[in-house]
Amino acid sequence: MEDIKIKEIFENIYEVDLGDGLKRIATKSIVKGKKVYDEKIIKIGDEEYRIWNPNKSKLAAAIIKGLKVMPIKRDSKILYLGASAGTTPSHVADIADKGIVYAIEYAPRIMRELLDACAERENIIPILGDANKPQEYANIVEKVDVIYEDVAQPNQAEILIKNAKWFLKKGGYGMIAIKARSIDVTKDPKEIFKEQKEILEAGGFKIVDEVDIEPFEKDHVMFVGIWEGK
């Protein structure tokens, strides 16, 4: 264990050096002794750190690719759109260990996997719902500090704006993984990213960071914006 070096780069997010030259990040697990997927766990003293795989998480990929603005903090309230099986939400819950994660997933079959991932993470509230219809979960979700979206729909940017109008505090942050191929397979991805950025800005976001997450995901960009409201 002597050759393991660990350094906090954002709140509750750590850069891990195992001495092999590879760039790795990890979150400090809030549920010790439990894996959510096949992540490697490193024990240092009384703490357990879960290696965060950038091939399975667009947020991890963005951090490794140089994300500068990371709005998710220890006490953040987060609305997570497109929670899937819970891989990234479980790490987000580790980061926001004093906060809460409202995890929205549309597919009932995947929801079962999400429930398993959330079982012992008391700060995740899994919700079966359609991110296109925020009014359907408005009785559960409170005002939040951050909305994170990973939804492969042609109207991805509009979904973020719609949910921001319902739930995002003014001055809060939106984070969105834009997948060019979900919007238009015939267009140049760079043109799509430019258009989506303009939609987000026209909808009320001031974009403060953007990261291309290749080689982990092809034709994906992570945008981070401050909600100024419309």
Curated annotation (Swiss-Prot):
Keywords, in A-Z order: Methyltransferase, RNA-binding, rRNA processing, Transferase, tRNA processing
Annotated HAMAP family: RNA_methyltransf_FlpA (MF_00351)
EC number, UniProt record: 2.1.1.-
Membership in a protein family: Belongs to the methyltransferase superfamily. Fibrillarin family.
CDD domains membership: AdoMet_MTases (cd02440)
Pfam families on file: Fibrillarin
BP terms from Gene Ontology: box C/D sno(s)RNA 3'-end processing; rRNA methylation; tRNA processing
Function: Involved in pre-rRNA and tRNA processing. Utilizes the methyl donor S-adenosyl-L-methionine to catalyze the site-specific 2'-hydroxyl methylation of ribose moieties in rRNA and tRNA. Site specificity is provided by a guide RNA that base pairs with the substrate. Methylation occurs at a characteristic distance from the sequence involved in base pairing with the guide RNA.
Residue sites binding S-adenosyl-L-methionine per the record: 87-88, 105-106, 130-131, 150-153
UniProt cross-references to PANTHER family, sorted A to Z: FIBRILLARIN, RRNA 2-O-METHYLTRANSFERASE FIBRILLARIN
Phylogenetic classification of the source organism: Archaea, Methanobacteriati, Methanobacteriota, Methanomada group, Methanococci
InterPro entries linked to this entry: Fibrillarin, Fibrillarin_CS, SAM-dependent_MTases_sf
Entry's Gene Ontology molecular function annotations: histone H2AQ104 methyltransferase activity; RNA binding; rRNA methyltransferase activity
Enzyme class, spelled out: transferase
Subunit structure: Interacts with nop5. Component of box C/D small ribonucleoprotein (sRNP) particles that contain rpl7ae, FlpA and nop5, plus a guide RNA.
Cystine crosslinks: none
PROSITE patterns: FIBRILLARIN
Name of this chain's protein: Fibrillarin-like rRNA/tRNA 2'-O-methyltransferase
Organism of this sequence: Methanocaldococcus jannaschii (strain ATCC 43067 / DSM 2661 / JAL-1 / JCM 10045 / NBRC 100440)
